[in-house]
Amino acid sequence: MINIRKSHPLMKIVNNAFIDLPAPSNISSWWNFGSLLGICLILQILTGLFLAMHYTADTTTAFSSVTHICRDVNYGWIIRYMHANGASMFFICLFMHVGRGLYYGSYMFLETWNIGVILLFTVMATAFMGYVLPWGQMSFWGATVITNLLSAIPYIGTNLVEWIWGGFSVDKATLTRFFAFHFILPFIIAALAMVHLLFLHETGSNNPTGIPSDADKIPFHPYYTIKDILGALLMILALMMLVLFSPDLLGDPDNYTPANPLNTPPHIKPEWYFLFAYAILRSIPNKLGGVLALVLSILILIFMPLLHTSKQRSMMFRPFSQCLFWILVADLLTLTWIGGQPVEHPFIIIGQLASIMYFLIILVLMPVTSTIENNLLKW
């Protein structure tokens, strides 16, 4: 009799995706982040569900309801901080996952990569709307500043912003719809992640060498299930250290002040994981130009397969491209730092130079370096 896991219609899908899946024998820990992102998503949906049971999406009571969760609900404080810091872990894993894709040329799986970029945008939208919900000062002013960027769109901009607000300013209608979207989007993300996985399993995983690994495959279980469990334990350890020892480390103190439309905080800034894009936005003096640069800073990932000029897929055997990649990482860290600084000398010029470097490396230096490497190898 055939094994039930291979014959049952539902079990068969799970089996082909997580048990008998042929995987390359040499994938490193950089391939752990996909499963970690899945765990982050499940964790966020569960903690979010329990928070939603006690939260009220109304401008008069939103801030109080979050305080109530932390003070009066059984283990409410840990659920709230796991959700807030879980978002940070989510983005750490996301950046590592995308960085892995760039380094090892995983973007050559076009459908998988494009759905990944759509997922990145969706997660960023979800995180932004979630940050508005506690209705603190930074929630309110962050929502005002970011939604206002859409007014830079010619002709329809102002109407679009007022349509999103549901009025003439960020108010009750805005908060209610942001809560609705923040609740539904994670489920859309889960569905997209399954499509992401579906397309990945059409081609099989890439590996560090970038060479086809059809000749040397091993079953996903037990080799990579045990490896993923180790990664998950380490991530949960890091998350719980953050939650239990310094839950407010990555938050903004301004968000412990209830939202006040009459009082603008001295420095409006988003959560740390958006700071690099925020720095790029601020480095361009023109409003529309800044918005375009902001969108392009992420959308540029879509063009990675077109910018790939090397005859090799991975950067494993390309030292010059490796140097450029790590300069790009350093540049992104610089942008993240600048995004959190006030708009004054010398931060303005550093931000502008780092923004130029970001686009220069991706659009010019990497393709040129790849071509030079091809010529050095007489290819």
From Swiss-Prot:
It is found in: Mitochondrion inner membrane. The keyword Signal does not apply. GO terms for molecular function: metal ion binding; ubiquinol-cytochrome-c reductase activity. Heme b b562 binds at residues 83, 182. The chain crosses the membrane at residues 33-53, 77-98, 113-133, 178-198, 226-246, 288-308, 320-340, 347-367. Heme b b566 binds at residues 97, 196. Pfam families: Cytochrom_B_C (PF00032), Cytochrome_B (PF00033). InterPro entries: Cyt_b/b6_C (IPR005798), Cyt_b/b6_C_sf (IPR036150), Cyt_b/b6_N (IPR005797), Cytb/b6-like_sf (IPR027387), Cytochrome_b (IPR030689), Cytochrome_b_C_euk/bac (IPR048260), Cytochrome_b_N_euk/bac (IPR048259), Di-haem_cyt_TM (IPR016174). It comes from the Eukaryota. A ubiquinone binds at residue 201. Its main location: mitochondrion. Keywords: Electron transport, Heme, Iron, Membrane, Metal-binding, Mitochondrion, Mitochondrion inner membrane, Respiratory chain, Transmembrane, Transmembrane helix, Transport, Ubiquinone. The cytochrome bc1 complex contains 11 subunits: 3 respiratory subunits (MT-CYB, CYC1 and UQCRFS1), 2 core proteins (UQCRC1 and UQCRC2) and 6 low-molecular weight proteins (UQCRH/QCR6, UQCRB/QCR7, UQCRQ/QCR8, UQCR10/QCR9, UQCR11/QCR10 and a cleavage product of UQCRFS1). This cytochrome bc1 complex then forms a dimer. Belongs to the cytochrome b family. This is Cytochrome b. It comes from Antilocapra americana (Pronghorn). The lineage of its organism: Eukaryota, Metazoa, Chordata, Craniata, Vertebrata.
